[in-house]
Amino acid sequence: MGRLVGHTDKTPVSLGLLGAAAFMVIADVRVIDPLLHIIAKEFNVGVGSAAVIVSAYTIPYGLFQLVYGPLGDRIGKLKVITAALTAFAVGTALCAFVSNIALLTLLRFLTGVFAAGIIPVTLAYIGDNFPYTERQAAIGKYLSALVLGQILGGSLGGIFGEYISWRDIFLLFGIVSLAIAGLLWRGTRNFRDGNRSTERFSLATFKPYYQLLTQPTARTVIIAVFIEGFCLMGAFAYCGAFLRDRYGLPYVTIGFMLSSFGLGGLIYSRSVKWLVQRLGEIGLMGVGGWLMCICFLAIALLHNWLLFIPFCALMGLAFYMMHSTLQTQATELAPEARGTAVSLFAFNLFIGQGIGAAVFGRVVDNFGYIPCFIIAGIVLALLATWLFTKGKAEAEVRG
């Protein structure tokens, strides 16, 4: 992918290496999707109850955005990314040795705490090095690594779950993440980030969060990404168990099927410029949300597992159409403190996912998968309509 800017003394590590770190974080999240049914069976709990390991990861991931954003602005974003990835690697590897669901939940919680300091801080770092007109394309390239994590995370989870052991995939991810952290440390140990804030880290550090929320645009972005995380990511966590329970498919097949979501994201990353030119930011959010609704309804109501693959891929494309647009807007909410702005954005995304996974877990255990997917789809359509109409109205006011 090349370096962030043309001068190697300013950016000591490549965007590709930062993308590798992001790949591991996303793969670590998505690997759970095909394994949830296996883990529930091994520890003798329901699928909805086993999903506590999803919430245990995503809720602290969201909460600690509020710490890592300002911390990155003050001590240097690359240092935060390197330290967080190192701790993430250790926590992930230890998941391979748990003896009960409670210990796995605790380790997933700690891993989520450390994972929080990687992707959003990197996005803020990209924001510091690209002008706004080039930023969405740059973020689109960075998203390629995240999409690859989406694709291979689910696939590897299915392969290990079916043929090896779900424990070994965590050990593998931990070792690889530690190696990437070592490469980051080698490139950044003598680097001083010129974009650091000079203010001391204290309770006053969190004041910018309140200031951001006083902005109407910021409130719109934050509310939208919370709903997106709650509905899309919260409900999607149950797709793997749904495929197993409804169709009795092998775990390896389920893993590859879930990976089609990432394929849709890859299509987005390769066509982002064309999509932006054709639809604009407002159109991307509207069309993306409506397509996500259609996909959830199709998965719930069409009784053919082969149809899951194209609709899952379309859902991935639709998700990135909306999410990447919101993400790009988030990088411009506070140009003087992008780490803080992006962290507030990620906080709401993953808090939404954690709460959504818990709520939809209760829905699945008590009413089944179909109501879960229908509710998620309808709410996403309403979100898309709100963003589209609000965006159109604001564009008309601007003239």
PLM feature spans:
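Juxtamembrane intracellular "pre-TM" segments in multi-pass secondary transporters
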Residues: G2-H7, R189-V221
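Helix-breaking motifs and short loop linkers at transmembrane-helix boundaries and internal kinks
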Residues: N44, G76, F97-L103, F114, ...
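Conserved MFS/SLC helix-loop-helix module at the cytosolic interface between two early adjacent transmembrane helices
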Residues: L63-S99
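Helix-to-loop junctions at the C-terminal end of transmembrane segments
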Residues: Q65-G76, I267-G280, V364-D365
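Paired small-residue
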Residues: A87, G91, A102-L110, L306-L314
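Helix-loop-helix hairpin linking two adjacent transmembrane segments in secondary transporters
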Residues: L103, Y132, K141-T188
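Cytoplasmic helix-loop-helix junction between adjacent transmembrane helices
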Residues: L107-L148
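C-terminal transmembrane helical hairpin of 12-TM major facilitator-type secondary transporters
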Residues: I282-L326
